[in-house]
Amino acid sequence: MLAVCVSLLALAGCRTESGDSALPRQERLMAVGETKATADSEQALAAEPVSASASSAQAPDSSVAGRALRILSFNVRTWTRDRDADSEVFWRTRMEAMERMIEDLNPDVLCFQEMLFPATRYVPDGYRRVGALNISHPIYVRKGLRARSSEIAIRWQACTVEGVRIINVHSSWDAEITQRTVEQVNAQLTSREPALACGDWNVRLATLQKVGLQMESARVLLGVPEDDTFANFKRPTESHGPIDHFFVRGLTPLSYRQITDSYGCAKMSDHYPILLDIAK
């Protein structure tokens, strides 16, 4: 029985979209390297004691009925080379701040990037994970919402929450990878359900438009000026522009926020979280 369970977990973690098996050798090698780096990072973090969170997400307030979903996208950068507990960017200090932020903002869906296993303990108890267990860009959904997982790939994973297709992306600045990621995201779009794609795309809006992303920027639709979403740890004055994005198709964005409050720590990550309310 134990062997069967292990096999099923391995299959869930290794599931990818049908096109991934045909990835070029260079990207397959890069993916293997990323997996090894993630494993090494998780092993290093696992050596440090982590207390389980006793907090839970607050119940939805009365305003939830007036919108379809609230989505948080956040590259948390769980692991940093600085493992000194007194450091202002110590990973556990930042994850405790992340937990406070989630409880304050009360999202329905959490789309993370660069989240290694120890950091998942800081996701409040009111959420459940949807999709593969071993990827670093997981999706969490508030318990009680209808959600089902679907395709999972190296650079993204998708699920459907309350009839909305949600695609969580962690892409690259590399032009070839950006092109391939956009093509794969476009392939997830159907006429049957509205869609939202979010995450750390690592490139600016103009680049994604140039390579043919078939979705609209929620920030642009709402008339929100662009701002730098990359909060560089080492070079805080260096500007990269907005590289974390929300895109929609068949949905109405209601409000967009870039979260600059650090919730009691110096910086939660080298990216600012972004928050979007949408309606069907």
Describe the function of each predicted region.
Residues 49, 60-63, 109-176, 254, ...:
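Structured beta-strand-rich core segments of catalytic domains in phosphoester-bond hydrolases
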Residues 23-60, 151, 160, 175-180, ...:
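Metal-dependent phosphoester-hydrolase catalytic domains
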Residues 74-76, 115, 169-171, 199-201, ...:
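Active-site metal-binding loops of divalent metal-dependent hydrolases
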Residues 2-10:
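Bacterial N-terminal signal peptides
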Residues 87-95, 113-116, 133, 175-179, ...:
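Solvent-exposed, acidic/flexible segments
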Residues 12-121, 280:
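N-terminal, active-site-proximal structural segment of metallo-dependent hydrolase catalytic domains
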Residues 74, 128-133, 215-219:
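Short hydrophobic/aromatic-enriched beta-strand-loop microsegments
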Residues 70-72, 165-167, 277:
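A fold-wide structural signal in alpha/beta-hydrolase
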